Swiss-Prot record:
GO cellular component, one term: nucleus
Main location: nucleus
InterPro entries per the UniProt record, alphabetical: Ribosom_reg
Family label: Belongs to the RRS1 family.
One of the GO BP terms on file: ribosome biogenesis
The protein, known as: Ribosome biogenesis regulatory protein homolog
Quaternary organization: Component of a hexameric 5S RNP precursor complex, composed of 5S RNA, RRS1, RPF2, RPL5, RPL11 and SYO1; this complex acts as a precursor for ribosome assembly.
Chain's role: Involved in ribosomal large subunit assembly.
Tagged with keyword Nucleus: yes
Record region (Disordered): 82-103
Compartment(s) where it occurs, according to its Swiss-Prot or TrEMBL record: Nucleus
Taxon lineage: Eukaryota, Fungi, Dikarya, Ascomycota, Pezizomycotina
Keyword ATP-binding included in the entry's annotation: no
Amino acid sequence: MSTDTSKPARLPVTVEKPTPYTFDLGLLLANDPNPVNVPKTTDTQVLEQHLASVARDGAQVLINQLLTTTTITATKDGVLLTLPPPTTPLPREKPVPQPKPETKWQAFARRRGIKPKTREQRRNLQYNPTTGQWERKWGYKGANKRGETDPIIEVSAAKEAMRPEGTSVRGDKRREIRARVKKNQKQMLRNQRIAAEKMGKK
């Protein structure tokens, strides 16, 4: 009884081409400038084998280039190759975005040395020592709305005498909020117009 112990032939490690390959190792790219001579046959298996051979040659020369030109480091996790920076410029679909002009607040904060609030400072929570619990600073059941729903509200007789007819102390807060929102929207539109004018001058 005989057994077939033949092994597939080892493919060559070196690849010779009329025109040398060019490389961009930073992108793991090997460019083959040589034309691909596709065999004139309708047998798809022959075509696939030929294209696989061309692809194999490209992969082999890329591996050879990596092993001979890059820095190789042995670590406990294995062998590491340090790739150089890419050299192939990649085209952009869109133009490079222009830097946004400073808003009025950003310019003011830069002049005064005001730093952005930290994440802790932006938290919408504060400790209420009276109740011993954490509560929201604003929003639903926020501390800034404390007293608005109390059944009895302390008022000043002098201020009540000067109050416009048809208004009540309970509506003051809502009117203040609406006026502040309207003012902020007006200021935002003004800042957007100024920013657009600055962008148009560049």
